[in-house]
Amino acid sequence: MRDYVIGVDGGTGGARAFVFDRSGHVLGQSTAHYETYYPQPGWAEQRPADWLDAVSRSVREAVRSAGVAPSQIAALTAATTSCTVLTCSQKGETDDPAILWMDMRAAEQARLIGERTGERPSAELYPCKALWIREHQPERFSAAQVVCEYQDYLNYHLTGRWCCSVNTACNWGYNRRKGAFDRGFYEKLDFTELLDKIPVPALAAGEPIGPLTAAAAQALGLDTGVLVAQGGIDSSIGMLGMGAARPGTAALMTGSSNLLMALTPQPLFTSPEAFNAGPDFLVPGCYSSFGGQTSTGSILRWFQREFCRDLGEDALAQLDQLAKDVPCGSNGIQVLDYWQGNRMPHNDPDVRGLIYGLSM
């Protein structure tokens, strides 16, 4: 009897796998870490092969810790970071690093898109990063048969089937109600060739993609009877997990960044610095409106990496204890959390972080 399901979270710092029963109780879980590389200020990259390895290791350990047999797993779905962009062949092969969601190298492309379309996209978004690749790495772009996101790449390697997520594609000009991408948007950019490299069809969260391939089943320690269903952006799927899935609800997601997302019948914000996605970005009939910051928890990790190497794995717990003795106002120390630019309210990828008020 296949009574259990697996949820995978492909996050910034690693892959986490959870085994759930039919009531939603967690029976087992595991985390496998991978590295982020920062080759230049404002850049952030990861190796796609590291994702596959981490997902395999975390799933195997989660199933083991749950004490269930692989033959009892019915389905698997994954949520990942976005927009984390990569190029690959039709067979999912790539030697190039993925451009991580927090990467701000496409600032100029974001401004160009704004000038030509009247919108003001974040440099985090897929079209901006894809346009950067075409302009700065034309051979890579020309050779690529697929330009996709982490979500799409992972699902392909699990099932052997290309598709994209409605949840991510709505950030690229996909209209769920029409079932098509906005070709006019890409024509304004003279970038319609990208449409031929986007993996289709677009599937909504929960829709079946297909069973695990034999190779994927072996890597994960499962069997080919496991169905893979479409997931979405980690923050969006987290919102569903919190039960914030009706018009008029909102949720705050925290991690390497933070994001406050609200579901409304109509766009909530009118400021060009704000961001609305939809319609039907996550929940049919709803727009999704966002606010948040690119660098939050990632700054804590930066501080740990640069200044707390001798404290070991529990460095953050030790910092928590030290912080309890710091008075309100932090003795005048102020931190602007712009390590990777500002997401809201300025939507400025070029600004950088600041620690102000240092003294002897």
What name fits each language-model region?
Residues 30-69, 118:
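N-terminal phosphate-binding loop and adjacent alpha-helix
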Residues 34-45, 163-169, 192-199, 355-360:
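Gly-rich Lys/Arg/Thr-decorated short loops/hinges at beta-loop-alpha junctions or inter-strand turns
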Residues 1-31, 38, 70, 74-111, ...:
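Glycine/Thr-rich phosphate-binding loops that ligate phosphate moieties of nucleotide
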Residues 20-21, 86-89, 133-135, 156-157, ...:
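Short beta-strand-to-turn element immediately C-terminal to the catalytic PLP-Schiff-base lysine
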